[in-house]
């Protein structure tokens, strides 16, 4: 059986790792063993932080909505409850964007949420709320 020499494949593999390690500090950018470890760790961090990024954005949207809603005399939790009672289904990303770029439209949503909450307070039920969007 012929001897298999991996020179070309190994060189390509090393080149791929070093390309991924470009911009790293010290030996991590040009020594195969340390570069491979650094690249593997970087991939783990990237995987983890793609999940964390989603959490961070949701928290940011909630903070923005809370700040905007407090100008109208509501808290974030009461506002979301009012929107649910009114049957308005808008996600937090859109609400945050509306609060920043379209304050009039956001104000209308806050008014609808307040109306639904007041109706709930008066009647004790939100099932027959006529202002609900269904």
Swiss-Prot record:
<comment type="function">
    <text>Binds directly to 23S ribosomal RNA and is necessary for the in vitro assembly process of the 50S ribosomal subunit. It is not involved in the protein synthesizing functions of that subunit.</text>
</comment>
<comment type="similarity">
    <text>Belongs to the bacterial ribosomal protein bL20 family.</text>
</comment>
<dbReference type="GO" id="GO:0006412">
    <property type="term" value="P:translation"/>
</dbReference>
<dbReference type="InterPro" id="IPR049946">
    <property type="entry name" value="RIBOSOMAL_L20_CS"/>
</dbReference>
<keyword id="KW-0699">rRNA-binding</keyword>
<keyword id="KW-0689">Ribosomal protein</keyword>
<dbReference type="InterPro" id="IPR035566">
    <property type="entry name" value="Ribosomal_protein_bL20_C"/>
</dbReference>
<dbReference type="GO" id="GO:0003735">
    <property type="term" value="F:structural constituent of ribosome"/>
</dbReference>
<protein>
    <recommendedName>
        <fullName>Large ribosomal subunit protein bL20</fullName>
    </recommendedName>
</protein>
<dbReference type="GO" id="GO:0000027">
    <property type="term" value="P:ribosomal large subunit assembly"/>
</dbReference>
<dbReference type="GO" id="GO:0005840">
    <property type="term" value="C:ribosome"/>
</dbReference>
<dbReference type="InterPro" id="IPR005813">
    <property type="entry name" value="Ribosomal_bL20"/>
</dbReference>
<keyword id="KW-0687">Ribonucleoprotein</keyword>
<dbReference type="GO" id="GO:1990904">
    <property type="term" value="C:ribonucleoprotein complex"/>
</dbReference>
<dbReference type="GO" id="GO:0019843">
    <property type="term" value="F:rRNA binding"/>
</dbReference>
<dbReference type="Pfam" id="PF00453">
    <property type="entry name" value="Ribosomal_L20"/>
</dbReference>
<keyword id="KW-0694">RNA-binding</keyword>
